[in-house]
Amino acid sequence: MELIPSFSLETWVLLAISLVLLYLYGTYSHGLFKKLGVSGPRPLPYFGNVLSYRKGVCEFDEECFKKYGKMWGVFEGKQPLLVITDPDVIKTVLVKECYSVFTNRRVFGPMGIMKNAVSVAEDEQWKRIRTLLSPTFTSGKLKDMFPIIGKYGDVLVRNLRKEAEKGKSVNMKDIFGAYSMDVITSTSFGVNIDSLGNPQDPFVENAKKLLRFNILDPFLLSVVLFPFLVPIFEVLNITMFPKSAVDFLTKSVKRIKESRLKDNQKPRVDFLQLMINSQNSKETDNHKALSDQELMAQSVIFIFAGYETTSNTLSFLLYILATHPDVQQKLQEEIDATFPNKAPPTYDVLAQMEYLDMVVNETLRMFPIAVRLDRLCKKDVEIHGVSIPKGTAVTVPIFVLHRDPQLWPEPEEFRPERFSKKNKDSINPYVYLPFGTGPRNCIGMRFAIMNMKLAIVRVLQNFSFKPCKETQIPLKINSQGLIRPEKPIFLKVVLRDETISGA
């Protein structure tokens, strides 16, 4: 008994009350789904179901889908997530009730200047920024930017040839990460970099700092488990994005903008210039124009949204081609017929390539960019007989939808024919969501697809890809954040002939 402290009765009572209060604080929201009649895995106090993500969010979602069916409830800390897979419910959330109820994405923590980014901004600010940015992503503007991207397609081919000539296997992420970084820094900041050849460039170093993201990161966990800390972090200027990187990039945008405004030469067409033009347009009311902070936030978010997504998808696609030589050959035949003698790709013709489109779409089905997407419920609402309280995050498990055998027969098989002209009209648009859908879908979708297609055409004009001893077969994925390979994808790169176009 000597091991037990000799506290007074009052002290023991206070300790007991404190423990009960701590337990209640860590669990007070955890009875929500039981009240609503929605099943789901049992949450832990404070953590909810977050610790189950250690094996991967995809794996966790697939287990829940098999066990609970089309709808289930989970908790990230005390935050309730209603996970939905029914296409009609998805349509209501992402499209029909987007403006009235499900306008905003869930914000995970203190954002600083990045709260002005189009993918983070809320309600009226989001609508205004989205309206101002939308003309930037029209086919006409993308066509104007195509020569900039084409230039980096040539750099990509040169870099790949250097690696192929070494006779060693090539890390796809190194090659396509450099291409992705070059295109984004060029179109968002007007900066020309060969990032593979200049990895120490401050733009490259700071851009990569933005991209170190893990769902089990201690800082991210702290704001998920203790959301009351977010305002404190904001006051202390501690944000989800590395301050040094954001400061460097925002100062660079400011400097480049000032330089362009002083320069009387005709500026080139890129995202940065188009945003500057929108600020100075007489057609835009001054109170509606992008502020300088908003302009800077968009430039930075383009890096965050575009680098990993493009480079990972291209890496996955080349892995698929290497392990499906029949698909690779058929795609090369289409490319050779469309652009004879390795002619440079053009914007309009690239968009019309049917088999290329099928291969890209099927790659994005098997390896979607994001594991999930979500919307925050702004008010109590009932949808298709389900009551959703205000503050609940409604989540769509994209990976689960894209691998559902009832929607996609033999979903683990790579079949571009699913997206042929004959078949794609039968696909429900609310079960294929690589870029989301509705008013808040990915604003850069067409840019991303154009960017990827150009890279694919340029490399397949000049090279073929084969598995090597370092290639992980079957490929395993890591889903603690974006979907990426568990191990780097290494492939053998073979010159198709001795002539290299654009290099």
Swiss-Prot record:
Binding positions for heme per the UniProt entry:
C442
**What membrane topology was assigned to this protein in its record?**
Peripheral membrane protein
Q: Keywords in alphabetical order, please.
A: Endoplasmic reticulum, Heme, Iron, Membrane, Metal-binding, Microsome, Monooxygenase, Oxidoreductase
Q: Which reaction does it catalyse?
A: an organic molecule + reduced [NADPH--hemoprotein reductase] + O2 = an alcohol + oxidized [NADPH--hemoprotein reductase] + H2O + H(+)
Task: Report the superkingdom from the record.
Answer: Eukaryota
Q: Does the keyword Metal-binding apply?
A: yes
Q: Name one Pfam family in it.
A: p450
Q: Could you tell me which SUPFAM superfamilies the record lists for this protein?
A: Cytochrome P450 (SSF48264)
Where is it localised? Endoplasmic reticulum membrane; Microsome membrane
Q: Which GO terms describe its cellular component?
A: endoplasmic reticulum membrane
Induction line = P450 can be induced to high levels in liver and other tissues by various foreign compounds, including drugs, pesticides, and carcinogens.
Identify which cofactors the protein needs according to its UniProt entry.
Answer: heme
Record keywords: Iron included? Answer: yes
Q: What is its EC number?
A: 1.14.14.1
Gene Ontology MF terms in the entry: heme binding; iron ion binding; monooxygenase activity; oxidoreductase activity, acting on paired donors, with incorporation or reduction of molecular oxygen, reduced flavin or flavoprotein as one donor, and incorporation of one atom of oxygen; testosterone 6-beta-hydroxylase activity
Under the heading Gene3D superfamilies, the entry gives: Cytochrome P450
InterPro entries per UniProt: Cyt_P450, Cyt_P450_CS, Cyt_P450_E_CYP3A, Cyt_P450_E_grp-II, Cyt_P450_sf, Cytochrome_P450_3A
Chief location of this protein within or outside the cell:
endoplasmic reticulum
| GO terms for biological process, alphabetical | oxidative demethylation; steroid metabolic process
The role this protein plays is: Cytochromes P450 are a group of heme-thiolate monooxygenases. In liver microsomes, this enzyme is involved in an NADPH-dependent electron transport pathway. It oxidizes a variety of structurally unrelated compounds, including steroids, fatty acids, and xenobiotics.
Q: Which family does it belong to?
A: Belongs to the cytochrome P450 family.
Q: What is this protein called?
A: Cytochrome P450 3A24
